[in-house]
UniProtKB/Swiss-Prot annotation:
InterPro entries: NAD(P)-bd_dom_sf, SDR_fam
Keywords (A to Z) from UniProt: Allergen, NADP, Oxidoreductase
Function: Interconverts D-mannitol and D-fructose. Not active with fructose 6-phosphate or NADH.
GO biological processes: mannitol metabolic process; protein homotetramerization
Name of this protein: NADP-dependent mannitol dehydrogenase
Catalysed reaction equations from the record: D-mannitol + NADP(+) = D-fructose + NADPH + H(+)
Similarity-based family: Belongs to the short-chain dehydrogenases/reductases (SDR) family.
Subunit structure: Exists as monomer, dimer and tetramer.
Length: 267
C-alpha cells in the first residue's frame, strides 16, 4: 500500500502553513531571483529555511539575515555546486545535522544559455546541461535518500516554459533540452517515489530576475509582444506556487508541472 497520506488539516490556512517544516532552496543568493522569493514565501509561512549559493556568499548571508529578521525563523546559507553530486550530498547531510530534517527541497539553481548549438561551444552545451539537468538529478538523488528514510518529503523542481516550447528569437537549445528533461524527471520521480515523496515542477516564463539583462532590448520587446499579458513576470508572483507544492495543501499533487508564463504557451 502507498505510504503517503492525505493532509490531516481541514483549514486551508493550516494546510498551507509550513511551521515546523524545514525547506531547502538552491540558488537563492540573489536579491530578487526566484530562489530567494521561494525562500521568502516559505519563511513567511513559518518554515525554517536553508538556502544555497555557488559563488555569491555575501549575497546569501545578506538574504539569511533578511529572512531571520523579517520572518523570525531560522535560516542558514550553504555553499553548494549542484553540478557535483558530492556537493549536493554534503548539503543534505549538513542541513539534516543543523536542522534535524528536510521536509521540502526546491531544486532551483540553474544556468542560462546564450547561443544555439552551431554558434555555441561543446563546453557551453555541457555546462548548461550539467548544471540544469544533471544538477537537478544530483539534488534529487541526494535528498531522495533522506525522504525515503523519513517516509515523507516534497521535491519541487524549477523547470521552465522553455521545456515546453522552443523560444524565439533567441537561440538556447541546450537550455530548452535541459528544462524539458527536468519536467520529465519530475514526472518520472513522482512515480518512482510514490510511496514516500511527492515530486512536482514549476515552469516559469519570462521572469524579471536580472539574468536576461544581456538580451538586447529589441529582442525583449519582441518576446513581450508574444506574451498575452504583455510583460515579464515578477519573481514574487511565483511564491504561492512554491509554498503550495512544499505544503500539506498539495498532498494529492504529484507529477504535476505548473506553467506560470503570462499565457505565452497558449499562443
Amino acid at each position: 500500500m502507498p505510504g503517503q497520506q492525505a493532509t490531516k488539516h481541514e483549514s486551508l490556512l493550516d494546510q498551507l502553513s509550513l511551521k515546523g517544516k524545514v525547506v531547502v532552496v538552491t540558488g537563492a543568493s540573489g536579491p530578487k531571483g526566484m530562489g530567494i522569493e521561494a525562500a521568502r514565501g516559505c519563511a513567511e509561512m513559518g518554515a525554517a529555511v536553508a538556502i544555497t549559493y555557488a559563488s555569491r556568499a555575501q549575497g546569501a548571508e545578506e538574504n539569511v539575515k533578511e529572512l531571520e529578521k523579517t520572518y523570525g525563523i531560522k535560516a542558514k546559507a550553504y555553499k553548494c555546486q549542484v553540478d557535483s553530486y558530492e556537493s549536493c550530498e554534503k548539503l543534505v547531510k549538513d542541513v539534516v545535522a543543523d536542522f534535524g530534517q528536510i521536509d521540502a527541497f526546491i531544486a532551483n539553481a540553474g544556468a542560462t544559455a546564450d547561443s544555439g548549438i552551431l554558434d555555441g561551444s561543446v563546453e557551453a552545451w555541457n555546462h548548461v546541461v550539467q548544471v540544469d539537468l544533471n544538477g537537478t538529478f544530483h539534488c534529487a538523488k541526494a535528498v531522495g535518500h533522506h525522504f525515503k528514510e523519513r517516509g515523507t518529503g516534497s521535491l519541487v523542481i524549477t523547470a521552465s516554459m522553455s521545456g515546453h516550447i522552443a523560444n524565439f528569437p533567441q537561440e538556447q537549445t541546450s537550455y530548452n533540452v535541459a528544462k524539458a528533461g527536468c519536467i520529465h524527471m519530475a514526472r518520472s520521480l513522482a512515480n518512482e517515489w510514490r510511496d514516500f515523496a511527492r515530486v512536482n515542477s514549476i515552469s516559469p516564463g519570462y521572469i524579471d530576475t536580472g539574468l536576461s539583462d544581456f538580451v538586447p532590448k529589441e529582442t525583449q520587446q519582441l518576446w513581450h509582444s508574444m506574451i498575452p499579458m504583455g510583460r515579464d513576470g515578477l519573481a514574487k508572483e511565483l511564491k504561492g506556487a512554491y509554498v503550495y507544492f512544499a505544503s500539506d495543501a498539495s498532498t494529492y499533487t504529484t507529477g504535476a508541472d505548473l506553467l506560470i508564463d503570462g499565457g505565452y504557451t497558449t499562443r
